[in-house]
From Swiss-Prot:
PROSITE patterns per the UniProt record, alphabetical: PROA
Organism the protein comes from: Brucella suis biovar 1 (strain 1330)
Primary location group: cytoplasm
Class of enzymatic activity (EC top level): oxidoreductase
Name the record gives this protein: Gamma-glutamyl phosphate reductase
UniProt-annotated location(s): Cytoplasm
Cellular component terms per the entry's GO annotation: cytoplasm
Signal peptide range in chain numbering: none
Family per similarity comment: Belongs to the gamma-glutamyl phosphate reductase family.
Taxonomic lineage: Bacteria, Pseudomonadati, Pseudomonadota, Alphaproteobacteria, Hyphomicrobiales
Entry keyword set: Amino-acid biosynthesis, Cytoplasm, NADP, Oxidoreductase, Proline biosynthesis
Biological-process GO terms, alphabetical: L-proline biosynthetic process
Amino acid sequence: MTKDIAQVMAEVGRKAKAAAAPLSIATSEQKNKALNAAADAILEARADILEANRLDLANAEKNGMAASFVDRLTLNEARIDAIAEDIRAIATLPDPVGEVIAEWDRPNGLHIERVRTPLGVIGVIYESRPNVTADAGALCLKAGNAVILRGGSDSAHSSAAIHKALVKGLEAANLPADAIQIVPVTDRAAVGEMLKGLGGAIDVIVPRGGKSLVARVQSEARVPVFAHLEGICHLYIDKSADLDMARRIALDAKMRRTGICGAAETLLVDRAVASTHLAPILGDLAAGGCEIRGSAEVLALYPAAKPATEEDWSTEYLDAIISVALVDGISGAIDHINRYSSHHTEAIVAEDAQTVARFFNEIDSAILLHNASTQFADGGEFGMGAEIGIATGKMHARGPVGVEQLTSFKYRVRGSGQVRG
């Protein structure tokens, strides 16, 4: 790490801290004006953004990056339209800042209110997905937070072009341009500086990316982190489940999009209905192109499966692969999930109310679903608008991190001359 990088990042932190103060008291109208103007600017800069993206794609091709990586990096007309639409959607969300969460009166006449406030300065560290530049910038702005964006170097040109449009939005609403900054250097030492907190400037870090990035952030950060390391999500089929429903949900939970953190990675089936339910469900998955890895009991009932190893139960595949085991009812499912889960998302298919109640009460994961696909683990599906990520920690934010989760709170206490005496 060079002294220059430390100095550059310290200046970024100072600017963000200075911008956070006026942004925290900006009106809803100002913030929405900035967001809509940013969406307009992105559409107006379409040609520039596509040209910048072509430079990033050329570098990716030269470096032999995988097809899935190139797809995440690629922007086109439709994706730029979607970025602008997402920003406009964030503008339509209720402004959380200033919301009175709770209020009560004390016997001495004091009136107490708990009120939402911005967090301050948020650092977002992400890999080469240019749309995150827009999503994170817009969400933080809506919640009244300044943000420092550090995207992957592979998307540097694309992110810079999008950032330019976001700044135009801020300027159109007379908000500080430094409220949304992009790290001006690609040196990885800049990430290390952010994880130290930039001298107290950063209030929280949000990593968006693969396991290695998130693990580094969680181990090195000296400020709070909103993140999940893995999405080892389970789907349990109870003996009381409707088979047709179970088949639909299992296929969607695994195969709708295999590479997202809400995709099911392990299927658990109640041993009591294995003889009737297992083969149809696994047949659907196999027909959809999914590789089945099963326990010895599963192999006996479904010989087309491959043997599962101990490692499979704690693996996030992010691919068309699923591990399958039989369990002794809800108790067995709870034991397995609490042992192997990453505490992201779990789902149960069941009709018995007591079984569902145990699932909800005894499993400690951020998102629990009944008779619905794990792929609903998404801020947009929760009605939160876009999300900046999903958190599995227990402090402050848990589950989808949307605008509301990017706030803290303070207490306002109104009196009429009371003294404690």
